[in-house]
Amino acid sequence: MTSLPNLLSRSDYLLALPMLVLSGFAVAILLLDLVLPKGWKRWNAALALAGLAAATMSLAKVWQAVYYIETPESKRFSGFLGSLVMDRFAIYFYLLFIVGAAVAILMSIRYMEIEHEDHGEYHALILFATIGMMCMASGMDLILLFVGLELMALSTYVLVGFLKRDKRSNEAALKYLLLGAFSSGIFAYGLSLFYGLTGSTNLTEIANKLAQRMADNPRDPIALLALITTATGLLFKIAAVPFHQWAPDAYEGAPTAVTGFMSVAVKAAGWAMLLRIFLFMLWPMREQYTPILIFVAVATMIGGNFAALTQTNVKRLLAYSSISHVGYMLLGLVASDGKNSSTGIKGILVYLAVYTFMNLGAFAVITSLRRRDIIGDELDDLAGLFFKAPSEAVLLLVFLLSLAGIPPLAGFWGKYYIFLSLMETGHYTLAVVAVLFAVLGMYYYLRIANAAFMREAVDAEPVKISPSLGAALWISALGTLGIGLFPEVFLRIVNWSLALSGDARVIGLLR
């Protein structure tokens, strides 16, 4: 029997280097936490940030390998018997995950001390979740994608319930676990059906065999059932209506830094896997899944925007806001016809990046309001923020206006490319509907701004910004303003990343 070392080469280990680095640092944090005295717990956060920095450097090494092997026919570096790939698409998402994890850790340091929950396993779980996300962005095999999804999900279940003394946190974790396990079961059932139909777990082979099968019978009932169950699992992970019920409760009950992490990095991972599966494996079924996506996208915009209008808890409001943004991004997928437009996919990638900065910034402001006996996540807690912390209030306004899509901030460019892609592909009605909902969304963002700038403070407790939280705020602000004011630099990066492993002629992303 062939041994594992003989099956794997040095290039396989190089491909997995960022994940191996993060695994090493996560284990080191768990061991270090056993011997660190209570006053030294911040070293856990420092070690986690060092691990993310080391993973970034190892990613540069992997990118170098991808760069040197690129040809017009091949733009990927594959390993582990073809189940794991590193292409520009994966590198782009790796960077989003690392930025999201790093800013979340910076937000957490003081917050978790106030909550008396500054344990090493918290930072280790963020790193383990990031490893799962990397598998989801790089996977070209159904089994690896599912393992990555579950590693991320199990880590985030624990992170949501990390405030053991908080009933809301415990309740949110239980709901998230039960609904997440149910959706994972449906997703696994869909994947098993595709395996039964094609006899393979490799995305390339499944795509080829599906193309033959759909050419013979476009209404194949087993293939349609596999599509629906797989799509259900994927849409749950990105919190699309009607599979969004977990998001408001999980976002409200989780530690605020974890909420920020889930709203950007976890969501980006779900999108990375969704794009790989829909744009490549399921591309032969695009005529079957496009009507489903249109229905879900419109329902998501309706549900997210209207539910956000009545919320008084800021974290819950931003949860519904996050759901509405998923609707816009799904329209980008609808508009990616693979013939004459890659603008929709460009819009999704831009949207995910700018959303990372502006949403983390908004949650960083909410994190700063947690002090003594004040939770800080209600609209009343924001009252008079401008008079107590004017610079922080101005930054909050920048993040809110960017979320609303106001030019020249970063959020404008995400919506612009989504709407442009709809116009390019003749979806004029969807474009008008999306614009109307974007205008509606301004109302609930202005409600938050109104509380911060126009209302009197309900408490005299000062707002103090720790150095780590200040760093998180300014990283978010620089990303939001930088992409908004200098979009051409960032768009070059996005255009570079529009290379998805597989046959580009099939998925239509390269021209």
UniProtKB/Swiss-Prot annotation:
<dbReference type="InterPro" id="IPR010096">
    <property type="entry name" value="NADH-Q_OxRdtase_suN/2"/>
</dbReference>
<feature type="transmembrane region" description="Helical">
    <location>
        <begin position="221"/>
        <end position="241"/>
    </location>
</feature>
<dbReference type="GO" id="GO:0048038">
    <property type="term" value="F:quinone binding"/>
</dbReference>
<dbReference type="GO" id="GO:0008137">
    <property type="term" value="F:NADH dehydrogenase (ubiquinone) activity"/>
</dbReference>
<feature type="transmembrane region" description="Helical">
    <location>
        <begin position="177"/>
        <end position="197"/>
    </location>
</feature>
<keyword id="KW-0830">Ubiquinone</keyword>
<feature type="transmembrane region" description="Helical">
    <location>
        <begin position="393"/>
        <end position="413"/>
    </location>
</feature>
<feature type="transmembrane region" description="Helical">
    <location>
        <begin position="142"/>
        <end position="162"/>
    </location>
</feature>
<keyword id="KW-1133">Transmembrane helix</keyword>
<feature type="transmembrane region" description="Helical">
    <location>
        <begin position="289"/>
        <end position="309"/>
    </location>
</feature>
<feature type="transmembrane region" description="Helical">
    <location>
        <begin position="46"/>
        <end position="66"/>
    </location>
</feature>
<comment type="subunit">
    <text>NDH-1 is composed of 14 different subunits. Subunits NuoA, H, J, K, L, M, N constitute the membrane sector of the complex.</text>
</comment>
<feature type="transmembrane region" description="Helical">
    <location>
        <begin position="426"/>
        <end position="446"/>
    </location>
</feature>
<dbReference type="GO" id="GO:0050136">
    <property type="term" value="F:NADH:ubiquinone reductase (non-electrogenic) activity"/>
</dbReference>
<feature type="transmembrane region" description="Helical">
    <location>
        <begin position="15"/>
        <end position="35"/>
    </location>
</feature>
<protein>
    <recommendedName>
        <fullName>NADH-quinone oxidoreductase subunit N 1</fullName>
        <ecNumber>7.1.1.-</ecNumber>
    </recommendedName>
</protein>
<keyword id="KW-1003">Cell membrane</keyword>
<keyword id="KW-0997">Cell inner membrane</keyword>
<feature type="transmembrane region" description="Helical">
    <location>
        <begin position="317"/>
        <end position="337"/>
    </location>
</feature>
<dbReference type="GO" id="GO:0005886">
    <property type="term" value="C:plasma membrane"/>
</dbReference>
<keyword id="KW-0874">Quinone</keyword>
<keyword id="KW-0812">Transmembrane</keyword>
<comment type="similarity">
    <text>Belongs to the complex I subunit 2 family.</text>
</comment>
<keyword id="KW-0472">Membrane</keyword>
<comment type="function">
    <text>NDH-1 shuttles electrons from NADH, via FMN and iron-sulfur (Fe-S) centers, to quinones in the respiratory chain. The immediate electron acceptor for the enzyme in this species is believed to be ubiquinone. Couples the redox reaction to proton translocation (for every two electrons transferred, four hydrogen ions are translocated across the cytoplasmic membrane), and thus conserves the redox energy in a proton gradient.</text>
</comment>
<dbReference type="InterPro" id="IPR001750">
    <property type="entry name" value="ND/Mrp_TM"/>
</dbReference>
<feature type="transmembrane region" description="Helical">
    <location>
        <begin position="471"/>
        <end position="491"/>
    </location>
</feature>
<feature type="transmembrane region" description="Helical">
    <location>
        <begin position="89"/>
        <end position="109"/>
    </location>
</feature>
<feature type="transmembrane region" description="Helical">
    <location>
        <begin position="264"/>
        <end position="284"/>
    </location>
</feature>
<dbReference type="Pfam" id="PF00361">
    <property type="entry name" value="Proton_antipo_M"/>
</dbReference>
<keyword id="KW-0520">NAD</keyword>
<feature type="transmembrane region" description="Helical">
    <location>
        <begin position="120"/>
        <end position="140"/>
    </location>
</feature>
<keyword id="KW-1278">Translocase</keyword>
<keyword id="KW-0813">Transport</keyword>
<feature type="transmembrane region" description="Helical">
    <location>
        <begin position="347"/>
        <end position="367"/>
    </location>
</feature>
<dbReference type="GO" id="GO:0042773">
    <property type="term" value="P:ATP synthesis coupled electron transport"/>
</dbReference>
